[in-house]
């Protein structure tokens, strides 16, 4: 079986999909098809409950694709990799850590506090 590797050559075994907290952000970083693809490689996907609501994707659709639904953002953020649509917001800075692989868009010029939080982690 193939494995998914981070930039530091550490195997990614779990991926978290938190609900986006930015105002008026309705997208979600992973669809059920993405869950199925990662499951093929033995990666466990944990989706925060309601993460897909803004994109009309139900928790049940994620479960049918093989994901586990977790009740809190902390549960989603505690995985090897986290996938998001937008940069972390200040209320998410506490979830950043040295061994986290974060896959997201970053607009650091407009949000220097995000750059500082990422460097500090």
Protein language model features and the residues they cover:
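Structural/interface elements that position substrates and couple domains in central-metabolism enzymes
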Residues: 2-120
């Amino acid at each position: 079986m193939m494995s998914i590797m981070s930039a530091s050559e550490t195997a990614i075994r779990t991926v978290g999909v938190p609900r986006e907290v930015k105002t008026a952000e309705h997208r979600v970083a992973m669809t059920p098809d993405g869950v199925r693809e990662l499951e093929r490689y033995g990666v466990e996907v944990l989706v925060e409950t309601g993460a897909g609501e803004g994109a009309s994707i139900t928790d049940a659709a994620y479960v049918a694709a093989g994901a586990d639904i977790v009740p809190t953002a902390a549960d989603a953020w505690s995985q090897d990799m986290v996938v998001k649509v937008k940069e972390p917001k200040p209320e998410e800075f506490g979830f950043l850590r040295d061994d986290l692989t974060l896959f997201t868009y970053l607009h650091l010029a407009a949000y220097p506090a995000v750059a500082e939080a990422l460097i500090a982690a």
